[in-house]
Amino acid sequence: MPIGASKLKFRINYILNVMRTWYCFNIKNKNVKYNGFIRVMKGTRFNPGYEFVLGHNVQFGPNCLLDTGANMGNNILLAGNVCFIGKNDHTFNILGKTIWSSPRGKNNPIIVENDVWIGHGAIIMSGIKIGAGSIVASGAVVTKDVPPCAIVGGNPARIIKYRFDNDEDKKRHCEWLSKQ
């Protein structure tokens, strides 16, 4: 509990989070399967046309939009306004058809492995795999797979650096994560 916070306020917020999460996944979004503790802040939306599988300790910041399917591991942090969107939402190359009247394309799910932090306002395109232990910077647009323990940022997202300075530490961390 944070210093200076009242126990009553903490307990009320905890109960409200449990109720919001239960409502979100058992009443509103039955297409979401979860396995463990999940925290969903206000305004987070899941597209009912896709399947979502969530691990343990997954937190969605306020106003996240998951508009394409996702398989998420354990210990995932999504800051506010993170978007999972489809690359193939609109078919635009059918002769004699407008984009408006064209059928929607198929989007593959996004895979987020264990121990990933996705910063505020990041956009992740469908079919992307975000490797274990990775960090996606605020505002990044991820159009390609992210390797394990990489820190990526920019538009399009590129590797800025790795969480660990040497390959041995990265390997040990990934092995430890695979046992979790």
Where are these regions (language model features)?
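A contiguous, mid-protein "functional segment" used to position or interact
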Residues: 141, 147-162
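Terminal amphipathic alpha-helical/low-complexity segments used for targeting or macromolecular assembly
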Residues: 1-30, 36-37, 75, 90-95, ...
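A secondary-structure boundary/capping signal
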Residues: 42, 80, 138, 155-156
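Short-chain dehydrogenase/reductase
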Residues: 59, 117, 135, 151-153
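Residue-level recognition of oxygen-bearing side chains
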Residues: 71, 129, 147
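Beta-rich strand-turn-strand
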Residues: 117-135, 140-144
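Flexible, glycine/small-residue-enriched loop-and-beta-strand segment within the central core
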Residues: 42-54, 59-125, 163-164
